[in-house]
Amino acid sequence: MTEGLFLKAVLLFLVAFVGYMHSYWGSTMHNRPLIMGTLVGLVLGDVKTGIIIGSTLELAFLGAVPIGASNPPDMTAGAVIATAFTILTGADSGMAVTIAIPVAALVALFDNFQMMFLLTQAGHMCDKAAANGDYRKVEKIARISSIGNKALLALLVALGFYFGSSAIETFVNWVPEWVSHGMD
């Protein structure tokens, strides 16, 4: 892989991490596709297309809000990856939606699994620390596991971008035009 692609993957990791950290300070909503698309456009040198793709994906993910224990599709991953590949391949916003929805669903599935295993372990560690009266350790574990969770998801996005470039390009070329332009 080229050095330029690696640098873009690192920058997209940072964009995704910023998006995932929206819930760390309360729900700031800066993980929404419009914000993520704009930041991806800034990183890749095409802010206008980033805003257009982000706006389109915002409509697609309009109702994707976690309520209670529900975990909607991961719009951060969907927006970052779809915007990046749309900008790099020169595809249109219809193709961005075609890429974003399955990516968002797959990353949400991964997130559910890692929450079941990794964050459950962190919860047990917090329980033990609380039982021993070590509240500083509870806070430390909670912060590290929360930030680690977000970093893991951002890493997944960056790796998906870095290693998935050729796969996404093949997918974009394979998808029939009526699928990507179905809502025109």
Question: Which functions belong to the PLM regions below?
Answer:
Residues 44-52, 90-103, 131-136:
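Hydrophobic alpha-helical transmembrane segments
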Residues 1-72, 76:
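Hydrophobic transmembrane alpha-helices
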Residues 15, 22-27, 57-61, 93-100, ...:
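Aromatic-residue detector
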Residues 55, 59-126:
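Hydrophobic, small-residue-rich transmembrane alpha-helices and their short perimembrane loops
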Residues 2-8, 15-18, 72-91, 129-137, ...:
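Transmembrane alpha-helical segments and their short flanking loops
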